[in-house]
């Protein structure tokens, strides 16, 4: 059956969930292109009777980061559909590294994650993201994630600028390096981490692979942490 030209999804998109991805998959079966409309702050308040917990620009960037979305537009009282600029455009410029490995938990994917991953993407030809398992997070931090490892893995896998995703079950980076060599035919050239991980056991690297730290915008340091958004997520679900 021939697909229809354009499918449109309208959403508040405060968080990317498996339901978001399932909706995109269903739409992809029927339409050759998908447009996602994000409610403006004013429209969100009008529809849901409260302010969104993430700004319009943050919600747009989440939508733009998804592989199944061809373009994003603002949903407001204006009926005109105007496509917004994409969050990421592939570059043909030579990169500093061939294969970069980025480990992390990526719970309740947020702007801080996007900033970090986009910086990493600009530094390499191939971006491999390691998503920490539930067991590893508990062992390292003594707390549980809001989203399961399968959900977090699937969400990161569906980001347009991520090439490969790997479930991390140990702090031993040689295991990740072996996985990359087996699946990509070459070893990791660099490990990229957020600067908030400096000075702890994440820096231990007996394999000699360079570790480079990226800096988040200090202006958004508080709201760019998963612990902040776990609290907001719980408050949101308690009030509904």
PLM region descriptions:
Residues 1-240:
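Nucleotidyltransferase catalytic core that binds NTPs
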């Amino acid at each position: 059956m021939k697909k229809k030209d354009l499918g449109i999804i309208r959403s508040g998109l405060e968080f990317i969930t498996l339901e978001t991805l399932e909706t995109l998959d269903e739409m992809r079966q029927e339409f050759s292109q998908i447009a996602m409309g994000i409610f403006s702050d004013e429209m969100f308040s009008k529809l849901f009777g409260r302010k969104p917990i993430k700004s319009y620009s943050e919600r747009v960037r989440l939508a733009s980061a998804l592989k199944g979305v061809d373009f994003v537009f603002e949903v407001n009282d204006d009926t005109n559909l105007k496509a917004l600029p994409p969050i990421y455009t592939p570059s043909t410029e030579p990169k500093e590294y061939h294969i970069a490995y980025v480990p992390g938990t990526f719970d309740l994917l947020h702007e801080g994650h996007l900033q970090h991953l986009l910086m990493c993407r600009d530094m390499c030809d191939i971006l491999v993201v390691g998503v920490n398992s539930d067991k590893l997070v508990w062992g390292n931090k003594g707390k549980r994630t809001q989203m399961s490892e399968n959900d977090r893995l699937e969400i990161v896998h569906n980001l347009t600028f991520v090439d490969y995703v790997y479930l991390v079950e140990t702090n031993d980076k040689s295991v990740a390096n072996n996985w990359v060599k087996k699946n990509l035919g070459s070893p990791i050239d660099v490990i990229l981490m957020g600067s908030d991980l400096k000075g702890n056991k994440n820096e231990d690297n007996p394999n000699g692979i360079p570790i480079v730290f990226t800096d988040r915008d200090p202006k958004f340091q508080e709201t760019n942490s998963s612990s902040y958004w776990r609290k907001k997520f719980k408050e949101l679900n308690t009030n509904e």
